[in-house]
């Protein structure tokens, strides 16, 4: 009980999520995907802020699924993923799970 109460008082970092770039694999779409009317609403440069490691309002659910564990870890003050992967150890570059048109997101701790 004491540990649970103590953990709830820890200050969590805010985490900024920035949409960096989308790639489209037209050859794969033509070969495998059924035509769809509506795809991703995310725009390059779009930003969200995660507070207390929670999904920001308006964030694509599929993108959040891909990055959630990294955002939660950064919010708790953890970082240095994969032992020196990123120049900024309190950040990560994550792509969404859309195999035809993945979006890359830069996630970083902010003050």
Label every model-predicted segment.
Residues 10-14, 100-102:
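A general secondary-structure signal for short beta-strands and their flanking turns/coil
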Residues 14-22:
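A short beta-strand micro-motif
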Residues 24-29:
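Short N-terminal binding/cap micro-motifs at the start of the first secondary-structure element
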Residues 30-55:
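Short, flexible N-terminal segments of the mature chain
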Residues 55-65:
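Short, Lys/Arg- and Gly-enriched loop/turn segments at beta-strand edges
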Residues 67-111:
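Short, compact, well-ordered microdomains
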């Amino acid at each position: 009980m004491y540990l649970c109460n103590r953990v709830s008082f820890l200050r969590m970092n805010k985490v900024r999520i920035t949409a960096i770039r989308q790639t489209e694999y037209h050859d794969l779409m033509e070969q495998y995907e059924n035509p769809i009317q509506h795809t991703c609403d995310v725009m390059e440069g779009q930003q969200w802020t995660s507070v207390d490691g929670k999904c920001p309002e308006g964030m694509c659910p599929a993108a959040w699924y891909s990055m959630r564990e990294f955002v939660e870890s950064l919010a708790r003050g953890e970082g240095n993923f994969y032992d020196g992967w990123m120049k900024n150890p309190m950040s990560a570059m994550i792509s969404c799970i859309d195999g035809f048109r993945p979006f890359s997101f830069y996630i970083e701790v902010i003050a």
